[in-house]
């Protein structure tokens, strides 16, 4: 039952002395529902003390009907949990569903389950009886919280609302306006921040598009630009040129340091390749080469002096000769007028103990059966020359054909060891006979050379000669002596066939193409070589006194008597003999020389010579023709039997010297 006296909020408020001017939460409308009248009276007094407007009900159904009639007549409801007609939780549900008012539950039962049930059903608070005034003073906060979330100004703007409610509504509206303003400000800030972010993203996208569209322009090195680059590099120096300085000197807009660095690297690679090609083609621009060094050939003569002949005769110490030769191995000598250039020849490969198979040409080739002259015996690496030998003579390069008719091993030297066939150009010869120099007794076999000797005049310019072009050195002529015809004629008169130095007239310049084997070939050669002047040629075979270390060396002699008289060719000594195939003995050691017409390799290296013996051609290993009728067994037997064998006439004489004395 509702207490009408207390249910009138304005009347009770006026009687209590309240006014509309009291601030919030005064005049808060409260509906109290409880079946205990004592508890109901106590609550009414405490709520009125707090300036609330109170309405009392002792039944739950009466309170629910009152709320339904006046949905907007109350601000908050306080209900007991245990009532006889309706459970307090049931009322809580109806009020919450129909009026949506805040409901406070109260009970003497403080069990946790009951409190939890009230909260779960929608109660805003749970008060334990007896209720204290301190708890009632703060019930207004639930009204504010509820109104803040669900209060609608349009629904609560009617005249039926009391003044206290109007004040409360105005205050709530002010709060909501403030909240709306703050939220609008926040929303504006959020929108502005989002706008700024979008603008930043757009700017970044534009930057990316600009960076992608603005690629580095490719530099095209035109001819003018490259010339500026080369001029800057030449001014700075190739070694000292750096991209930064080159860029400053060029001063080209749009050109970067990276472009200059890349082009400089390519330019240096080009210069290295160009320098390598020029050095490979001849080393003519080498910094260690002078104008006088740009010729070919070993250091065999210096300013017209025959150093090796001077060393043999004792006028030049062997140590000095060795030093000069060692210094000259890698340095070409100066070419004299009227002389042909000859490539550097390795003097260590004079003898090679292998079986060469050398082609002589046109099906008449003669090869030696045994090229191993001294089987198992090491030979010296340098050949000594006799006094009077013209070492630095006119020579020409005649490459030997490398075809092997019978599949024998090739004895052709390498590129640096090409054989040189040269003829003497010296017209002077003060020696009328051969002088054999024995290495073991140099003081007895050497003599002082006169100043008019051919050693001191190796390069005459007044020699009448005929010339012919060379295949390997175009434009270089080789003077030859007329005395070669005498050698050919004397060989024909003796009955032998001269099989050497022929073939110079062949257009192919093959040294072995025109070597004859029969007498009719010699006549043809005589007709071809009428105007040739080949002089000062000879062959010296020498053997050591010790048979175990014997060796054969080819040397050059300058005597004109080698090609004149047969009596001079018959001179011999009786130290040791070498038995030939026809019963003739080759004497070794010997002080006399049997001089034969031959062509030798310049600088004391390999010689190629021809002999007057019929059908024989001699050469040392590595492209020199050996006497075919004297095989290895004959020579070895001769060297081993040199002791105790009497002197026998022969056409070949050998002068021996120790291999150990050969200068390297």
From Swiss-Prot:
CDD domains: REC_typeB_ARR-like (cd17584). Two-component system major event consists of a His-to-Asp phosphorelay between a sensor histidine kinase (HK) and a response regulator (RR). In plants, the His-to-Asp phosphorelay involves an additional intermediate named Histidine-containing phosphotransfer protein (HPt). This multistep phosphorelay consists of a His-Asp-His-Asp sequential transfer of a phosphate group between first a His and an Asp of the HK protein, followed by the transfer to a conserved His of the HPt protein and finally the transfer to an Asp in the receiver domain of the RR protein. Residues 200-209 have a biased composition (Acidic residues). Its main location: nucleus. Residues 29-144 form the Response regulatory domain. The keyword Nucleus applies. InterPro entries: ARR-like, CheY-like_superfamily, Homeodomain-like_sf, Myb_dom, Myb_dom_plants, Response_reg_B-typ_pln, SANT/Myb, Sig_transdc_resp-reg_receiver. NCBIfam families: myb_SHAQKYF. This is Two-component response regulator ARR2. It comes from Arabidopsis thaliana (Mouse-ear cress). The gene is ARR2.
């Amino acid at each position: 039952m509702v207490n009408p006296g207390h249910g009138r909020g304005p009347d009770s408020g006026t009687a209590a002395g309240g006014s509309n001017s009291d601030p919030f939460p005064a005049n808060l409308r409260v509906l109290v529902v409880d079946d205990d009248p004592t508890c109901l009276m106590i609550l009414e007094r405490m709520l009125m003390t707090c300036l609330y407007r109170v309405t009392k009900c002792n039944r739950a159904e009466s309170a629910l009907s009152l709320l339904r009639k006046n949905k907007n007549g109350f601000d908050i409801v306080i209900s007991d949990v245990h009532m006889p007609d309706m459970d307090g939780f049931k009322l809580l549900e109806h009020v919450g569903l129909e009026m949506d008012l805040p409901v406070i539950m109260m009970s003497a039962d403080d069990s946790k389950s009951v409190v939890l049930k009230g909260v779960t059903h929608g109660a805003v608070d749970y008060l334990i009886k007896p209720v204290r005034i301190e708890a009632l003073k703060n019930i207004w906060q639930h009204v504010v919280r509820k109104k803040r979330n669900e209060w609608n100004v349009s629904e609560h703007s009617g005249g039926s609302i009391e003044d206290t409610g109007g004040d409360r509504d105005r205050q709530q509206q002010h709060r909501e306006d403030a909240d709306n303003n703050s939220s609008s400000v926040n929303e504006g800030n959020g929108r502005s921040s989002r706008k700024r972010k979008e603008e930043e993203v757009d700017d970044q996208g534009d930057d990316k598009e600009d960076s992608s569209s603005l690629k580095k322009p490719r530099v095209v090195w035109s001819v003018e630009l490259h010339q500026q680059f080369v001029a800057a590099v030449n001014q700075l120096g190739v070694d000292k040129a750096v991209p930064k300085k080159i860029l400053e000197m060029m001063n080209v807009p749009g050109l970067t340091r990276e472009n200059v660095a890349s082009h400089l690297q390519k330019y240096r690679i080009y210069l290295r390749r160009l320098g390598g090609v020029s050095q490979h083609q001849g080393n003519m621009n080498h910094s260690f080469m002078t104008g006088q060094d740009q010729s070919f050939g070993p250091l065999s003569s210096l300013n017209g002096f025959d150093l090796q002949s001077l060393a043999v005769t004792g006028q030049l110490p062997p140590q000095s000769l060795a030093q000069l030769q060692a210094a000259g191995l890698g340095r070409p000598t100066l070419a004299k007028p009227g002389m042909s250039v000859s490539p550097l020849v390795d003097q260590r490969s004079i003898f090679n103990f292998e079986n060469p198979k050398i082609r002589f040409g046109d099906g008449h080739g003669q090869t030696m059966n045994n090229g191993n002259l001294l089987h198992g015996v090491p030979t010296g690496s340098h050949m000594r020359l006799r006094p009077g030998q013209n070492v630095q003579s006119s020579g020409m390069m005649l490459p030997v054909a490398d075809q092997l008719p019978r599949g024998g091993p090739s004895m052709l030297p390498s590129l640096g060891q090409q054989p040189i066939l040269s003829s003497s150009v010296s017209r002077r010869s003060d020696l009328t006979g051969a002088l054999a120099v024995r290495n073991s007794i140099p003081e007895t076999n050497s003599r002082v050379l006169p100043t008019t000797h051919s050693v001191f005049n190796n390069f005459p310019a007044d020699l009448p000669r005929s010339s012919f072009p060379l295949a390997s050195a175009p434009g270089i002529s080789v003077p030859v002596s007329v005395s070669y015809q005498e050698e050919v004629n004397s060989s024909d008169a003796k009955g032998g066939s001269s099989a050497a130095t022929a073939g110079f007239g062949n257009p192919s310049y093959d040294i072995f193409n025109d070597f004859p084997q029969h007498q009719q070939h010699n006549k043809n050669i005589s007709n071809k070589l009428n105007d040739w002047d080949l002089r000062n040629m000879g062959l010296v075979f020498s053997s050591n006194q010790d048979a175990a270390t014997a060796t054969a060396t080819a040397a050059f002699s300058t005597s004109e008597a080698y090609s004149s008289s047969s009596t001079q060719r018959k001179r011999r000594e009786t130290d040791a003999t070498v038995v030939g195939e026809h019963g003739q003995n080759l004497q070794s050691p010997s002080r006399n020389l049997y001089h034969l017409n031959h062509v030798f390799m310049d600088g004391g290296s390999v010689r190629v010579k021809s002999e007057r013996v019929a059908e024989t051609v001699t050469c040392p290993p590595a492209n020199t023709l050996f006497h075919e009728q004297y095989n290895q067994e004959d020579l070895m037997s001769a060297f081993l039997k040199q002791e105790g064998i009497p002197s026998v006439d022969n056409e070949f004489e050998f002068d021996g010297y120790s291999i150990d004395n050969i200068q390297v």
